[in-house]
């Protein structure tokens, strides 16, 4: 079990190495009781394109970041509390494979592993950590999660009005409630979604109409959050652009398919698939083995969890 690694020198050394790789762009990760369970590279579907991201699984959080030049440093660190994490496997098809959803209340997206074995390892270890954490804390699993954004490339026209053609002038926008790609005219309103932000967020007209009629007496879940938003006063969208402020910027280059990557390495629990020996030290970001990552593609749909691969929230 990973518990026996809590006070081990190997665990302390691994966490210190992760902190060093993020440098000043990250926050301190070492804390009492925290164990680094595993690490490796996954392909994450961002808003515009799939990109390689370095993931670190701890016994209480999931951390990931951008891989910087040379694969020796990482930046744009993101931390997801495991008690909020829920996974859902995505069936393989002719276009993409080895993928699954990672969902939380504030952010949801899809990742792809290089092989089916790596997918099984990642999902098994994450689920095990979530189960252990919830059991120890006595908390119940989170039921409501942020929607997965439909990728920009999957919508050439507005998914709401079916008329507006997206161009350099007619920009794409994402509904923060359902994840659909919509035009400015079909997403001119904002609504407070408390689980995602303390500020009102852009939503499509369909979601706005539904959310504003949610009774304020509801006690929990998504409808409760919507009721809170309705009671707090929502407004027209006064911003000119889609202020998602994510890291999926045009100047950031996509990682080419088939790029070499670090094989995932897991520590301390040999009962979960092919975990490595406790004595293993953290993998050097520069060491790698070859694995083919296929670019994912999906059919967009407007629903609470669109069958699409992208990102939600303010970051990618």
Curated annotation (Swiss-Prot):
The keyword Transmembrane helix does not apply. One of its GO terms (cellular component) is early endosome. Disruption phenotype: No visible phenotype. No effect on the subcellular localization or expression of Rab7, Rab11 and Avl. Residues 279-292 have a biased composition (Low complexity). It holds the Pfam family SOS1_NGEF_PH. One of its GO terms (molecular function) is zinc ion binding. A zinc finger (FYVE-type) spans 152-212. Zn(2+) 1 binds at residues 158, 161, 183, 186. GO terms for biological process: endocytosis; endosome organization; endosome to lysosome transport. It comes from the Eukaryota. Interacts with Gdi (Rab GDP dissociation inhibitor). The name 'rush hour' derives from the overexpression phenotype which displays a disruption to endosomal trafficking and cargo progression. This is Pleckstrin homology domain-containing family F member 1 homolog. It comes from Drosophila melanogaster (Fruit fly).
